[in-house]
Amino acid sequence: MTVPMATDNKLSFATRAIHAGYNSADNEGSLNPPIYMTSTYAFESVEQGAGRFSGEQQGHFYSRISNPTQEILETRLADLEEGEAALATASGMGAITATLWTLLAPGDQVLVDKTLYGCTFSFMEHGLKKFGIEICYADFTDHSEMAAGLSDKTKVVYFETPVNPNMRLIDIAAISSLVKAYSPNIKVIVDNTYCTPVLQRPLTLGADLVVHSATKYLGGHGDLIAGAVVGDAETIQQIRLFGLKDMTGAVISPMTVFLILRGIKTLPLRMERHCHNAQLMAEMLEQHPAVDRVFFPGLKSDPWHDLACRQMDDFGGMIALELKGGYEAGVRMLNRLRLIKLAVSLGDAETLIQHPASMTHSVYTLEERKRHGISEGLVRISAGLEAVTDIIADLEQAMAD
């Protein structure tokens, strides 16, 4: 894996993951950021308070809007994603909903890829539609089909890449170019949870905003729930003051912020191991007689391999597969695992496995899953940090006759 290195006097990614946004000299020499457990902030005068509320003066005034610990994380995330600003939230869905409530109004359209994380799909299909917002689905790997979905009502184009759970890849630069040629006012939003900025930086490829479930790789240890959105400073401020403050209240805890900051320090190292383990696991699974198909962009046989080589710095830690025998074979394999944990989520130190149709994507009906490309027998694996020989041995014994 190639972690972005220093260029033009800018520190390398791994260094910025540890230092960006924080100066110990400003905090009594504390090597780690302080955790500001406060809901409100004292003003020196009425005039100062009024200035902060109006936005004419910089500074914190209520922790539903901002917090000093949170500000460090937001500065670091913006730096790593190469955006102007960031907003941290209480969950990934908090980031997504706060963003879309800010950008959309009744009568607007969102053009989305046909396959989405289950809760994102549910919010689009069962949330936004209730408020007069049109949701249009298209296969974003077919650029003609995607372009045909654009209209004068389109305000947002939204997709994940790699796609959860079936590991399709979408060309960020190509989609962004098509959208901006149609209208520069349409916001292109990319969920970068699977890759993190270590592997992929959508803003540099033409996207306007990036969203994350920080619960996953950014935190990295399965002990927190959080989210983030990164983009231009003006839009992020609008999301902060409306989508977060007024619409969702999805406020992140300072303690959670501290844990994410700690996690990000080791993010480049962890992603290297996740990628290494996933590559070897996918190569084994591709050759296994019990496996019908493996979906992993690091395999040369994968239809998205060439795009991954152009768009990503490595192939990630997520694998999807279908076993011969379909759903029943998948259930048998999952129930026989000893080391690998049967659990939703991803990006933890532990290797996790789950069945999307009955778990993370069960909010789709059977017909919706068929239409959106999620098979009943699909199994999703998040490669952990264990010795890959132990992970592979567990998979092999679980698939044995």
PLM region spans:
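Conserved N-terminal alpha-helix of the aminotransferase class I/II PLP-enzyme fold
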Residues: 45-94, 124-126
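Acidic-histidine catalytic/liganding microenvironments
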Residues: 80, 285-289, 337
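N-terminal glycine-rich, Lys/His-bearing helix-loop that initiates the first secondary-structure elements
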Residues: 1-57
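PLP-dependent enzyme catalytic core of the Aspartate aminotransferase-like
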Residues: 2-3, 125, 134-136, 155, ...
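Short amphipathic alpha-helical segments
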Residues: 58, 84, 225, 256, ...
